[in-house]
Amino acid sequence: MKSAALLLPLYTAAFAAAAFHHEHAQAVIQDQQLTIVEPDEYLIELSPGETRWVNENEKWELRKKNINFFDITHNAELGTLNHRINAESVKYPSKPVFNETLAPLLKELDKNNMRAHLETFTSFHTRYYKSQYGVQSSAWLLGQVNKTLADAGAINASVKAFPHPWGQSSIIATIPGKSDKTIVIGAHQDSINLFFPAFLAAPGADDDGSGTVTILEALRVLLKSDEILKGEAENTIEFHWYSAEEGGLLGSQAIFQSYEKEARDVKAMLQQDMTGYVQKTLDAGEPESVGVITDFVDPGLTEFIKKIITVYCDIPYVLTKCGYACSDHASASKAGYPSAFVIESDFKYSDKKIHTTEDKIEYLSFDHMLQHARMTLALAYELAFAEFK
């Protein structure tokens, strides 16, 4: 397989922890370059066992046709080393039990925080994972997560950049509990314009700026719990912001491949990808709802999430499907971890402006995003205190 050299910026860990500003970020990034060897062709997996070699243009053409895939060129081992607990053995609570505790926390969720964060996040020309803007936006996001932990006085919690060879790092925030059993809440931070990824604008307000700021707000409010702050929860909680989802779930594959190798005990993973668009549902005369994905997910976790929505959200759920490898929860599933995915609506009514210059804030509902934040916060708290085998 032939390869070609592509120059990409090197985003240092020191800068990652300190960067908060666009101009500062660019000044640092331009001082350092990293030579990365990019393959001429990529091995993708379109369904279990169905693989194909494609070039980069062919990858984007598949995405334009709404065909999803894993890019397994450098992640072929994902799912092959899983000798830990079978994901099917995880038993979830029969029902939510922390209604009284969560009631005051849910009132703390603020859609204005989500709007402010999303306005900045979408101001980057693109968050394409192989661009300087993608590195800068990741630096800004890492700064916001750091600030969230600091403002909460979360001295036991931590956040780190998970580096990748393409430049844009993933981000992992960890709130330790009494055990290493882990609950993961995820979203992807990158965006893409499929018509010319390296150059055209990709504000990515809904995909997946909405999920990014939704889980950030859930993290902020979760840290208002003294029990969580003091590490008194039964389980550890992690918040992930994945790089390069649009390239074939690259960032999440790298993370869950490392977790699989380390035999990490992940009890649940929820993905929040696209949480803000509701207009097409309303135009169809349907009630506002959230879409619970039912294919290629863990049935037990999905059933518990349905109960969470019923108890803690002000709108109902609908059952819907999104296909194979449709978001980062698929990487967790492939590694043997139980995962679930909740999207903004029935999949057929989801945002069609994604992957273009028109994926803008003006088309989103922050009231709807608040419902996703309620679900995320409630699930994280309920499972933080759940007792697993």
Curated annotation (Swiss-Prot):
This protein's record includes keyword Membrane: no
Top-level taxon of origin: Eukaryota
Family, similarity comment: Belongs to the peptidase M28 family. M28E subfamily.
Glycan-modified residues: 99, 146, 156
Binding residue positions for Zn(2+) 1: 188, 207, 273
Keyword terms, alphabetized: Aminopeptidase, Disulfide bond, Glycoprotein, Hydrolase, Metal-binding, Protease, Secreted, Signal, Zinc, Zymogen
Entry note: cofactor: Binds 2 Zn(2+) ions per subunit.
GO terms for biological process, alphabetical: proteolysis
Designated name of the protein: Leucine aminopeptidase 1
UniProt cross-references to InterPro entries, sorted A to Z: M28_fam (IPR045175), Peptidase_M28 (IPR007484)
Binding site for Zn(2+) 2: 207, 246, 355
Propiece residue ranges: 19-89
Primary enzyme class: hydrolase
Known EC number: 3.4.11.-
Pfam assignment, any one: Peptidase_M28
